[in-house]
Amino acid sequence: MWVNPEEVLLANALWITERANPYFILQRRKGHGGDGGGGGGLAGLLVGTLDVVLDSSARVAPYRILYQTPDSLVYWTIACGGSRKEVTEHWEWLEQNLLQTLSIFENENDVTTFVRGKIQGIIAEYNKINDVKEDEDTEKFKEAIVKFHRLFGMPEEEKLVNYYSCSYWKGRVPRQGWMYLSINHLCFSSFLMGREAKLVIRWVDITQLEKNATLLLPDMIKVSTRSSEHFFSVFLNINETFKLMEQLANIAMRQLLDNEGFEQDRSLPKLKKKSPKKVSALKRDLDARAKSERYRALFRLPKDEKLDGHTDCTLWTPFNKMHILGQMFVSTNYICFTSKEENLCSLIIPLREVTIVEKADSCSVLPSPLSISTRNRMTFLFANLKDRDFLVQRISDFLQQTTSRIYSDKEFSGSCNSSDDEVYSRPSSLVSSSPQRSTSSDADGERPFNLNGNSVPTATQTLMTMYRRRSPEEFNPKLAKEFLKEQAWKIHFAEYGQGICMYRTEKTRELVLKGIPESMRGELWLLLSGAINEKATHPGYYEGLVEKSMGKYNLATEEIERDLHRSLPEHPAFQNEMGIAALRRVLTAYAFRNPNIGYCQAMNIVTSVLLLYAKEEEAFWLLVALCERMLPDYYNTRVVGALVDQGVFEELARDYVPQLYDCMQDLGVISTISLSWFLTLFLSVMPFESAVVVVDCFFYEGIKVIFQLALAVLDANVDKLLNCKDDGEAMTVLGRYLDSVTNKDSTLPPIPHLHSLLSDDVGPYPAVDIFRLIGTSYEKFGTIRADLIEQMRFKQRLKVIQTLEDTTKRNVVRTIVTETSFTIDELEELYALFKAEHLTSCYWGGSSNALDRHDPSLPYLEQYRIDFEQFKGMFVLLFPWACGTHSDVLASRLFQLLDENGDSLINFREFVSGLSAACHGDLTEKLKLLYKMHVLPEPSCDQDEPDSAFEATQYFFEDITPECTHVVGLDSRGKQSADDGFVTVSLKQDRGKRANSQENRNYLKLWTAENKSKSKTAKDLPKLNQGQFIELCKTMYNMFSEDPNEQELYHATAAVTSLLLEIGEVGKFFITQPAKEDAVPGPPCGQAIPGMLFPKKGSSQSYVVESTEPLTASLAVDSEEHSLGGQMEDIKLEDSSPRDNGACSSMLISDDDTKDDSSMSSYSVLSAGSHEEDKLHCEDIGEDTVLVRSSQGRATLPRSSSLDRDWAITFEQFLASLLTEPALVRYFDKPVCMMARVTSAKNIRMMGKPLTSASDYEISALSG
């Protein structure tokens, strides 16, 4: 390609000149190409090794063209190429278009200017024609991308993130090379002294990623997969490399978990022209994502908030009259601050609250100050800002966007929910739109919303307000303490501010740890969790969800209904319909908001507590914060998040209570207790009034406090747990301890915990104060940091998700192993290959949406599905019949056959059923599969139109022929009705019964798998018409095209084809014969025409295949130029017996009235062979045997333009005819080694794209 001219001082160093003229030189890199001239040898090896180690661009473009004037010592690179052909084209263009022109110039400087301008003009014109946009990647990185795609055969869709120099340890020998990190793969390439080694590992196959340090190798990264371990060392910046590897592995695990693909963020601001371009645009994107994730976690912001930038500054804090050093963070909707000293002060200022941003006057005490005022009359003063003008401009831009969004939201929502006070003051009305309650009113704690003209009942008061059970005389001391807590919080608000913009300090945490007053609990939960931000930015969202979900039912709503009455049944608020209805609405609304989660057990317990202290909409947004931000992946079908934190808890227990760890591991208690403790935040194992204090701390500190509390519980029971003999005893000890945790400050009447009611305590357990327990947890385990937990979570997430994937694989294999002929090992390999193809299509694209192909709610066997494009690739590599140009057509037919439900996707069970029949089925099963693939109608067929192939035969065989209405096609399924994909077989007794076909279809949908399997016997298979028979012949000829016994198989196929043509012709005679019975009487039913069923004594038959040209040429199938019929016209059948002019020689299909009308008789079809010793004797023929005879003349396959609509054959005839040819029998009986095919499929790359990779693989051996 043409490149911008660059100066080269040493033109011949490490390069060999191949062609030259007065102005241009074509050179080749030493070590590339072995056609003499010093290309090989030791010098070439050294140069090649040097290029790899130094990452030279000559590794990508080993050819180049230089420009030089005769009297100058400076050379200019003007073109380069990866192949000799590419660079030769550029050379010839220069000779034809520039060489003559340059001789006209007299000044060498003019020549140089002209050449440089010409080359730059060519590049600009190319970019304009091809619409090449400005790329932020450096030229060096672009070369690395080209090298990456060429070295590892990756498609263009595979994006390189970064590459690093390192050493890979193969045994005890390090191989110096380059590690390439792409979105989906970790790759390594090394070229030393002529030996090249490559390694490719998919991120989804990694089970462990560790940064280790040993005495010999202080910095080393260990990458583990299911089958091997890999070690990399000698990094220039190991921390940066490892962080990027962690991030890419996390993206891969997210893809396994919920099928989320990676999409590059195109909205990142471009770098300034003056800033150096050191990293790729994709690396910048990933770095920005990591920073945004930390930013959101630190300040509890919504999931879609993106960090724009951060800067060091100071904040003036009026409560202690100090300037606190810290960092300011600016994003699209928020300005946040956190101090350098942990927990000293933090601040969150939503831009929706900001009224004024102005630059204050600078002074020696306050250099570069910035003042920000909010609606609640708070002013924040920042100083020591490095680039204040730029910062003010960015904040102003974001403020304009925020203001426009606020106005548009107001216009959308109107006045129906402009403020809570307005809504509360509205008169109540009867509401009858709820499916659970017909009426409700404000007096009962519910209010009507007028959204789009519909009324949606939503509770306006907390359930605790309506169902408070306390007696002032009985609880006076506790009420006094509660009052003091409220006053302490009010004083705190007056000093530090109230609402989202308040200063959050160590004092705030102290008040939370002492317990939040009941009257303030809902407000502070919203504030501390960040749910108040989502509620404020989504007005009317919850009411819309409630309205949308009303009256709709699915699996989630069924599970919700089942668990409603199990949610705090001991509390009076959930002993009546009002509390139950509010809980139902919140859970159902969230299930519709997040269908990936829907509903998970334990959500009902947590939500019921939220409803006690927060209004209904507030409880919904608290649930959103809990499920999507604070406890990620906890509440899904596989509770992955809880399992990850269970692993983290085990590690923490090993570090902090080592004396107990081994004992707990032996008893298996940690895994049992952690799920129930973490999923419900101790609400299900601790008395209610104590558990809500844990929830208070959780909303302030996050998951950190749950780990601390769990460790404190174990630490308090060390001695008793060490004396336990089994897990039941240990669980009893912990259960009794948690039941004894009390809250002496609670103003609620004691609510007996359900666990304590059911347990048989031998005696009272000493009471444990919840505040003392929490204090102890901070004293002993307060050093646990949130960033440490995140690191441990990553390590456990890899292990947990891969363990779940292995469990899923075992469950699938165990379920399906009895249905197929594959071994367990073969099924496991096939499943890994099938899933890998599904995942590959997710990130490299496919013809269907990846989310449609993966549904975690389905059974394991149906979770991963592939479309036709993916199936076609696997068909070519795994199926024994894939051969030649006909493979795509055959794959399409098999895909239609396997796609039983007609959704254009097949799951693993369907895939394996077809593969098992084709590879390990007996001869009859294989031929039945081949027959069924061709009896399917064409994709363009219309469902309501009768199949033309059987139109005539069905009329006369209504009493015995099953009717097949299975019409499927890749292109036409979208237009078909809901009955698509069901095979409907109805044994017709009368033509008038066609009207009942719909009832039959509905009935057959209810058939069990056993009944379906019975209906697919050979007798029930539809007949093959002439067009389908032609396609079957084409398939068979293509199947044999690469077989060693190709000629023998062609001869055998020709004989079988001729035989079946004759059978079809005679079958047509006996089909049309009954229609003429009135005019021409036929023979009695029980009699056969003499000489037709049995040959005359002494007569013999033989089929002789003659051809005027070699059989290979005459029988070759070329669908583009000729039809199959024209190619088979030279197939002749000769009969040595006298010809009977009165009847057509054929196979007799005896439709005796004495046979059962509902089934077809089985016939053994026999044919005399071409050898004398194969003659049949009368005593060898059974009662139901039909002898095949042929007529004189030629039997040819008709052309498609003149198909005979009455011609048809059955599967029994096809099977029996093929059995007459030993060559065909041997071919279909030939065993197939599936493991060998799977192994080759792992490494084969098709069209520059790896089909699949079930695990890590080496492209070339690293042992060299």
Curated annotation (Swiss-Prot):
Keyword Repeat: yes
An example molecular function term from Gene Ontology annotations: GTPase activator activity
Domain Rab-GAP TBC: 515-702
Residue ranges of domain EF-hand in the record: 886-921
Record-marked site positions (Glutamine finger): Q601
Entry annotated with the keyword Repeat: yes
Site (Arginine finger): R562
Biased composition (Basic and acidic residues): 1119-1138
Biased composition (Low complexity): 425-441
CDD domains with a match to the protein in the record: PH-GRAM1_TCB1D9_TCB1D9B, PH-GRAM2_TCB1D9_TCB1D9B
Membrane spanning residue stretches: none
InterPro entries to which the protein is assigned, alphabetical: EF-hand-dom_pair (IPR011992), EF_hand_dom (IPR002048), GRAM (IPR004182), PH-like_dom_sf (IPR011993), Rab-GAP-TBC_dom (IPR000195), Rab-GAP_TBC_sf (IPR035969), TCB1D9/TCB1D9B_PH-GRAM1 (IPR036014), TCB1D9/TCB1D9B_PH-GRAM2 (IPR036017)
Keywords of this entry: GTPase activation, Repeat
Top-level taxon in the UniProt lineage: Eukaryota
Region Disordered, annotated ranges: 410-456, 1119-1162
Name of this chain's protein: TBC1 domain family member 9
Native source organism of the sequence: Mus musculus
Lineage of the organism: Eukaryota, Metazoa, Chordata, Craniata, Vertebrata
Gene: Tbc1d9
